[in-house]
């Protein structure tokens, strides 16, 4: 008889949709352990602007894969998949269920479908690219990438030499673009995955939540948090950490661009745009059960029934 794969739960949703609150309620009812799926929560010292769970919430429901990196460090979808699979195996070994919670859809996709193996770094080609950059400038190399791989060029900033160099290197080694290779699925996740997404039914309600949360962040000291990052000499606005929604707008304000009120407004607008992209991605997701942010009790019941039907007992 074939042994069943272990169960894992995905709880996705746009920013400010109530994912954390729902996850904590599940943690109190079932033997689940939470793994964060968020490209901003990985950074230490970025607590307020990321709406990171506070000490009380973490005491009720510890989260794995938060506060694992300094803001100066980079982290890829492949890094996340490796780390998440390790944490999931540890949770299952304890007889519990991995509950993956967050809004970084690329991480969920990488975990669920796997990633195609990219060619190993080639020091000779890497050096050629760096010499070209010294001679022509990174903008010229970005223009090259725009010609061969416009999709990657759109998401890689000209002032992000590490990712720009890698995209060009992959093409020169393999003859295929980074976009082509990453669209090829890798090894599927070795779990039975139940997938859920939570969001308000009305867009206006999500916008209201986003605005209220951003204003609360500012009241809680968000400006001071970004000032502490700004004061460091190893951080700059082209790093993935500083490009996080809210941080980039506050950083621009500290750089002398506009007023604080304008930075707050731009931060709210950027957060709305992020939520729109997240919802667009989720609408194309297969095998997804939607939950209503404004009816958390019903959401808990839906998840409870799904867990129970998969023969997982309550604690």
UniProtKB/Swiss-Prot annotation:
Pfam families: IPPT (PF01715). The keyword Glycoprotein does not apply. ATP binds at residues 13-20. Its cofactor is Mg(2+). Residues 38-41, 162-166, 243-248, 276-283 are annotated as: Interaction with substrate tRNA. Disulfide bonds: none annotated. It catalyses: adenosine(37) in tRNA + dimethylallyl diphosphate = N(6)-dimethylallyladenosine(37) in tRNA + diphosphate. GO terms for biological process: tRNA modification. GO terms for molecular function: ATP binding; tRNA dimethylallyltransferase activity. Its EC number is 2.5.1.75. InterPro entries: Dimethylallyltransferase, IPT, P-loop_NTPase. The record marks 104, 126 as: Interaction with substrate tRNA. Substrate binds at residues 15-20. Keywords: ATP-binding, Magnesium, Nucleotide-binding, Transferase, tRNA processing. Belongs to the IPP transferase family. Monomer. Catalyzes the transfer of a dimethylallyl group onto the adenine at position 37 in tRNAs that read codons beginning with uridine, leading to the formation of N6-(dimethylallyl)adenosine (i(6)A). This is tRNA dimethylallyltransferase. It comes from Vibrio cholerae serotype O1 (strain ATCC 39315 / El Tor Inaba N16961).
């Amino acid at each position: 008889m074939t042994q069943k794969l272990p169960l894992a739960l995905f709880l996705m949703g746009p920013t400010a949709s109530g994912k954390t609150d729902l996850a904590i309620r599940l943690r109190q009812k079932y033997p689940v352990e939470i793994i964060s799926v968020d490209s901003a929560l990985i950074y230490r010292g970025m607590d307020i602007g990321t709406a990171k769970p506070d000490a009380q919430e973490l005491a009720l429901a510890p989260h794995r894969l938060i506060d694992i990196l300094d803001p100066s460090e980079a982290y890829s979808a492949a890094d996340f998949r490796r780390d998440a699979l390790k944490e999931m195996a540890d949770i299952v070994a304890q007889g519990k269920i991995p509950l993956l919670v967050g809004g970084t859809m690329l991480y969920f996709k990488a975990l669920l479908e796997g990633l195609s193996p990219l060619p190993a770094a080639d020091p000779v080609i890497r050096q050629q690219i760096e010499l070209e950059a010294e001679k022509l400038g990174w903008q010229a190399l970005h223009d090259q990438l725009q010609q061969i791989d416009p999709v990657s060029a759109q998401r890689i900033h000209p002032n992000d030499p590490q990712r720009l160099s890698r995209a060009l290197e992959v093409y020169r080694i393999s003859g295929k673009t980074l976009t082509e290779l990453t669209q090829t699925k890798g090894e599927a996740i070795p779990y039975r995955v139940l997938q859920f997404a939570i969001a308000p039914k009305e867009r206006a309600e999500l916008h209201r939540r986003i605005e209220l949360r951003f204003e609360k962040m500012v009241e809680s000291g968000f400006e001071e948090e970004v000032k502490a990052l700004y004061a460091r000499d190893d951080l700059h606005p082209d790093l993935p950490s500083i490009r996080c929604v809210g941080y980039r707008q506050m950083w621009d304000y500290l750089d002398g661009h506009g007023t604080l009120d304008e930075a707050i407004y731009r931060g709210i607008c950027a957060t709305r745009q992020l939520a729109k992209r997240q919802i667009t991605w989720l609408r194309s997701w297969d095998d997804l059960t939607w939950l209503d942010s404004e009816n958390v009790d019903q959401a808990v019941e839906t998840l409870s029934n799904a867990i129970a039907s998969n023969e997982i007992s309550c604690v």
